Amino acid sequence: MTNTKLLRATIIQNGLTQDDVAKFLNISHQAFSNKINNKTEFKASEIIKLSELLGIENKDTIFFVQ
């Protein structure tokens, strides 16, 4: 499960919008919304890309929360 609050905060801290991130991942805004709201899971490749884009060092704190 994704830590939605922390991911949203990290996106904002990087001066990006959810639309910016969706475009970067080459997915629709709705697809990204579903992922960030834990309706669908992020793919491993998306987690890697997001971590690089947002400077996330510890992926577990955002993407693998129980």
Regions found by a protein language model. Give the residues of each.
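A short, Lys/Arg-rich alpha-helix, primarily the initiator
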Residues: M1-G15
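The alpha-helix within a helix-turn-helix
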Residues: I11, A22, S51
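Short alpha-helical DNA-recognition segment
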Residues: L16-N34
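A broad structural signal for alpha-helix termini and local helix breaks/kinks
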Residues: L25, L54-G55
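Short, basic-rich loop-to-helix N-cap that marks the start of a DNA-contacting helix
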Residues: K39-K49
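Short C-terminal boundary/hinge segments that cap the last helix of small helical domains
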Residues: G55-Q66
